[in-house]
A protein has these predicted regions:
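GNAT-family acyltransferases
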Residues: 1-110, 117, 135, 174-200
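Conserved acetyl-CoA-binding loop-helix of GNAT-fold acetyltransferases
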Residues: 112-115, 121-138, 156-161
Length: 200
């Protein structure tokens, strides 16, 4: 595993046309930014039709989206970022309800992420989550929930490395029968740990 000093610095970048080819290449290699369903083929088709519109739709606020069970629900405010180290590392997103730390029942957590297979086991997910927690504080959240599959030990370690504490095991029928873990990260307790990125 490369040391943190030798590894290129991770950035969270807003999706844009300049790095879209790297994103499309990852999709073409079978990676999906969605952990619940494989959207790689659908997104590749959208990029092929109109790359600019694809980026616009990714970043569009408001509107609705369809859950895996077909239910149409309002889209929450969100921040979508691509993890980048000179190459595409993966996807990470933050969603929230203004004025509250609570989430609707159909939203599994505030933050979701997916690292491309060839960049895993390098600490990128841990660092990406740390950077996104800074964004969560900036939008006023005092605590965030993150969920993961019970068998996803790597994801559990990523969350726990960012001070996540296990709250419960649960099943979300809309998203399948698998048992999931719900973690909570208290951001207020981390306020004294503000980094240079957060102060800038």
């Amino acid at each position: 595993m490369p040391s943190s000093s030798s590894r290129p610095r991770l950035q969270l970048l807003e999706p844009n046309l300049e790095i879209l080819p790297a994103y499309a290449e990852a999709l073409g290699r079978g990676w999906s930014p969605n952990n619940v369903e494989d959207v790689s083929a659908a997104q590749l088709a959208e990029i092929g039709r109109d790359p600019t519109e694809f980026i616009t739709e990714l970043l569009r606020q408001g509107g609705t989206f369809r859950l895996p069970d077909g239910t149409l629900v309002p889209k929450l405010p969100d921040r979508l970022r691509w993890m980048w180290d000179g190459e595409l590392v993966g996807h990470i997103g933050l969603r929230w309800q203004p004025g509250t730390d609570a989430l609707p029942a159909h939203v599994l957590g505030h933050i979701g992420y997916a690292v491309v297979p060839w960049k895993r086991r390098r600490g990128y997910a841990t660092e990406g989550l740390r950077l996104m927690l800074i964004e969560a504080r900036r939008v006023g959240l005092r605590r965030v929930e993150i969920t993961t599959d019970r068998l996803n030990i790597a994801s559990c370690r990523v969350i726990e490395a960012n001070r996540g504490r296990l709250v419960e095991e649960f099943v979300a029928p809309r998203f399948g029968p698998d048992v999931r873990l719900r973690y909570c990260i208290d951001l207020v307790e981390q306020g004294h740990d503000a980094t240079e990125e957060e102060r800038s």
